[in-house]
């Protein structure tokens, strides 16, 4: 592709072409002068253009190069004193020839004010002849010449005097009346409370407990948040926490003279016989009037007609006088060739082992990678031998299934479980399904206390990490192996162990756990407290243990930031509790389709402070586990004092749970607990987590 571009270079024409012409001379400005000013200028001009010619007599000789001074007034303001220093001089040369050389003097563009006495002197100088008839050594006065030996002092022009300005009379300085109120209020000290609080940089270990004990009684800490009341949803509710309004107690010495003075002044204000003139003696600022806006008078310049003609802008008037050759001499047309490169279209590579999915409801995209694992023959043989040694019955059943059973199992998988499957069907999954079908024919799940998932894991169908947990015979059925902790427990054993225990329920999840709460409080005297806790836990068993229920189907889901669905909730609970019990609910379909999900959850939640339990999605299993947790870790709180409970709002505002606050007030008061934290006593420190300890230390270092 070729494009033509027209380039215009600088022309060699005159500067007047196409713009303003360069003015040959300076612009003239007309200034209006009065008659008196015109007369003074004429007199000064005639004096400067006619230099003095001084000739000498035979007796006195000639004078060459004598200097005669002309003192000039400096421009000063009305308030400034005039101090004239004679600096610039005019040299008057003795010229013998008649006006052969005319001297050019520098003109001082200053406005001079001449009085009548000085005008007489200028008129005398004008009428002075070129040659002097009187001798030079004589002094000239107004009446004549006097005998004196001075050198030409009479040529010195006297200093021009200026008229005196009017003196600006200052404002009268009136004596101010003394005000009793102003004198009394000025003696008071000003005290201010900042709107924000600060925290000292010193560590808590450098604090002296004696100072804290002395200053603790002077202040009373109150809750800032709006009033709330903590209710007890049980039959044995004994306490009702209520908040009080915010107040500050400041103790002032009784012998404070300044405060007595202020009270005395306030009594005078409400006294009917108090003199009202005292209010008018208070100093007030002087009011200033608004100054009128000065209008700017713009100066008008008068230009001559010739200058106005040159300022007319006609760019084409001069160009028409030039020839075409002169115009197009500096104009060239250049040809440039360029090519357009097409953009390469890039397509996303499609992987043969993945499926791209689109969710029409959530308007999101996703992909699933598909893979097939090839089982090793040696590993399968060793695994079958170990299975036969552990459980002979299950091993015989897994080895005796025929081809018809395999075909039927494949047909069942392809028809019913295909929409929900997560990976390809392998030999391990097929063997697990066949084992489950044959086991259901021989045994019933309701007769045994072991669930189906524990049976599969104990039989060795899919691997799982064995974690030993100490159990008691009163809770579990000791006939079966307890290597995996997702079995149901008996109801009758736990009903007697939860009497007079106290737990807390999260107020945000009361509707979700309504059936569980009704079942726990139905046949037992259990204290149940509702607390609007910020965490995601369902129940709080004691001051350091909570129960959190999650769904196995949502565990591997990702949030918008890329983290797992329950990642943030579990981390927040670990900062507030020393033990977190996680109940994982799963369905029969997930157990059949994706058995690897269980050991992935177990591996991800592998922590010394986290206990994981897998149960079916039924309320009865969850109620049994809650009774077990209450019997094992819950406490009864009956030793609190009413004085200590009144200060519970301070610790609740720090994010502490209600059971932790009641545990603290069983052994400490609020002041004693603060002192124990400052001294870092082990008994008080063990109750709190690291996050709770930092918040409490920050409160203790609070200062105004």
Swiss-Prot record:
GO terms for biological process: chromosome segregation; meiotic cell cycle. Signal peptide: none annotated. Coiled coil: none annotated. One of its GO terms (molecular function) is nucleotide binding. The keyword Nucleotide-binding applies. It is found in: Nucleus; Chromosome. GO terms for cellular component: chromosome; nucleus. Interacts with ZIP3. Belongs to the ZIP2 family. This is Protein ZIP2.
